[in-house]
Amino acid sequence: MFSRIAAVSFLALPLLAAATPVLRRGDCNTGPIQCCQSTETAGSAAGSALLGLLGVVVQSVDVVLGLNCSPISVIGVGSGSACDASPVCCENNSVGGIISIGCVPIQL
């Protein structure tokens, strides 16, 4: 009986490993890769002041904001046009080009 359980477990292990998603470096599942000059949390002095000036309300003070962001092409990541500041993936890049909301830092 034990040998059957061991055999089934051993044969099922590769199925579990194959079903696990793996994100590659530079992948974004929240939005396009952006290069931001700086990042702040919504609860920081700079973040809350900027959100107040723009009249933007966010759900949490822990939301990461990208400031002065520009898009990075995936093709350019390895060829010298990489981001020297803060590479991030952001959910909402439509706040006038000044601020991006819901950013997640990534490694290029």
UniProtKB/Swiss-Prot annotation:
Q: Which cysteines bridge via disulfide bonds?
A: 28-89, 35-83, 36-69, 90-103
Q: In which tissues is it expressed?
A: Highky expressed in hyphae cultured in liquid medium.
The answer on whether this UniProt entry bears the keyword Ligase reads no
Listed A to Z, the keywords are: Cell wall, Disulfide bond, Glycoprotein, Secreted, Signal
Give the GO cellular component terms, alphabetically. Answer: extracellular region; fungal-type cell wall
Its main subcellular localisation, reduced to a broad class, is: secreted
Protein localization? Secreted; Secreted, Cell wall
GO molecular function annotation = structural constituent of cell wall
| Glycosylation positions in this chain | 92
- Read off the InterPro entries from this record: Hydrophobin
What Pfam family is a match for this entry?
Hydrophobin
In practice, how is this protein used? HgfII displays a better dispersion and emulsion stability in an aqueous solution with soybean oil than hgfI, which is of great significance in terms of expanding practical applications of class I hydrophobins.
The stretch of residues making up the signal peptide is: 1-19
Complex formation: Self-assembles to form functional amyloid fibrils called rodlets with a diameter of 15-30 nm. Self-assembly into fibrillar rodlets occurs spontaneously at hydrophobic:hydrophilic interfaces and the rodlets further associate laterally to form amphipathic monolayers.
The similarity comment for this entry is: Belongs to the fungal hydrophobin family.
Protein task: Aerial growth, conidiation, and dispersal of filamentous fungi in the environment rely upon a capability of their secreting small amphipathic proteins called hydrophobins (HPBs) with low sequence identity. Class I can self-assemble into an outermost layer of rodlet bundles on aerial cell surfaces, conferring cellular hydrophobicity that supports fungal growth, development and dispersal; whereas Class II form highly ordered films at water-air interfaces through intermolecular interactions but contribute nothing to the rodlet structure.
Name it: Class I hydrophobin hgfII
Record organism:
Grifola frondosa (Maitake)
Tell me the organism's taxonomic lineage: Eukaryota, Fungi, Dikarya, Basidiomycota, Agaricomycotina
